Design a protein with these regions (language model features):
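Conserved N-terminal subdomain of the carbohydrate kinase-like
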Residues: 1-117, 121, 268-281
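Charged C-terminal helix
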Residues: 237-284
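Short glycine/threonine-rich catalytic loop with a Thr-x-Gly-x-Asp
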Residues: 208-226
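Conserved active-site and cofactor/substrate-binding residues in soluble primary-metabolism enzymes
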Residues: 16-20, 27, 54-61, 87, ...
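Short glycine/serine- and small hydrophobic-enriched flexible loop segments
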Residues: 224-232, 245, 249
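Glycine/charged-rich beta-loop-alpha catalytic/anionic-binding loops adjacent to active sites
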Residues: 2-7, 200-211
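Conserved phosphate/ATP/ADP-binding segment of small-molecule kinases
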Residues: 123-203, 213, 233-237
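Glycine-rich beta-alpha junction loops
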Residues: 11, 38-40, 84, 114-116, ...
Length: 284
């Protein structure tokens, strides 16, 4: 059974961070050990929230407790998302190092959350530097959106060629696999959005309809599903197709519900067995 140590935020109401990643992974049959970096009432997109931000030493202590059970050797991947500060980033890197010492075959999957093309960069100014210089070089898999890819590599991905060049620059930094979770190239068909996966054996693109929806947590679900499918199959193209199909079904159901939060529980069957099967195109 695949086991993932997921170090992310958590909310009581809604689905972001671990509250978005854990259930879909479990629905796929993955054992998930969540370590929370915050436990808020709701995500910060509402403009107001309550609850504690975990101190770095508290997060480290939870990982240490897992290590003391002799369990880190069972971990196949460490998954991280939004990092609220530099110290949390260092705790994540320490957890990765300890996990890989216990299981050299384990991978580190990093969702380098920084912002998007609409909102710009919305994290502390130190975070992009931390990600670029310390975190991404230690990752085996990263899942940026197109904006974050450009920020990390100090490039300007636009069309397919420039986006592939930016991915190559990211892979030169350390990760062997890059999933670009939202590619908005100017020459794509109208009302569509794409994902691009690049692995050591090629590059693949998948296109889905672009729904008129802004859903907090969708990137967290995407990173989790792709990590799980890649661990299971070892095939980036298969992982890409499965992930895009499940995420589209989730977003479609969320859009149809008229609700702001992801309809994760309501979409559980589509997460495991997506209704839509989108074709994956080899682009290199």
């Amino acid at each position: 059974m695949t086991t993932i140590l997921s170090i992310q935020s958590s909310v009581a109401y809604g689905h972001v961070g671990n509250s978005a990643a854990v259930f879909p992974l479990q629905r796929l049959g993955v054992e998930v050990w969540p370590v929370h970096t915050v436990h808020f009432s709701n995500h910060t997109g509402y403009g107001a929230w309550r609850g504690p931000l975990m101190a770095p030493e508290e997060v480290r202590d939870v990982v240490t407790g897992v290590e003391e059970r002799g369990a880190l050797g069972e971990v196949d991947a460490v998954l991280s998302g939004y990092q609220g500060g530099e110290q949390i980033g260092e705790v994540v890197l320490d957890a990765v190092a300890r996990t890989k010492a216990a299981n050299p075959d384990a991978i580190y999957a990093c969702d380098p959350v920084m912002g998007n093309a609409t909102s710009g960069c919305f994290v502390h100014p130190a975070i992009p530097v931390l990600l670029r210089e310390r975190v991404v070089p230690r990752a085996d898999l990263i899942t940026p959106n197109q904006f974050e890819l450009g920020f990390l590599t100090e490039t300007e991905p636009g069309d397919l060629g420039s986006t592939l060049a930016s991915v190559d620059a990211a892979r030169d930094m350390g990760p062997s696999t890059v999933l670009v979770t939202s590619v908005l190239r100017p020459d794509r068909p109208k009302d569509t959005i794409e994902m691009l996966a690049v692995h050591h054996d090629g590059a693949w693109l998948v296109r889905t309809p672009h729904l008129p929806l802004t859903a907090n947590g969708s990137g967290d679900v995407t990173a989790a599903l792709f990590t799980a499918h890649l661990l299971e199959t070892g095939d980036a193209a298969v992982a890409l197709g499965r992930t895009a199909s499940s995420v589209f079904d989730l977003l479609r159901r969320t859009h149809e519900s008229g609700r702001r939060e992801l309809q994760l529980v309501q979409s559980q069957e589509e997460i495991a067995n997506p209704r839509m099967q989108f074709a994956v195109e080899r682009v290199r």
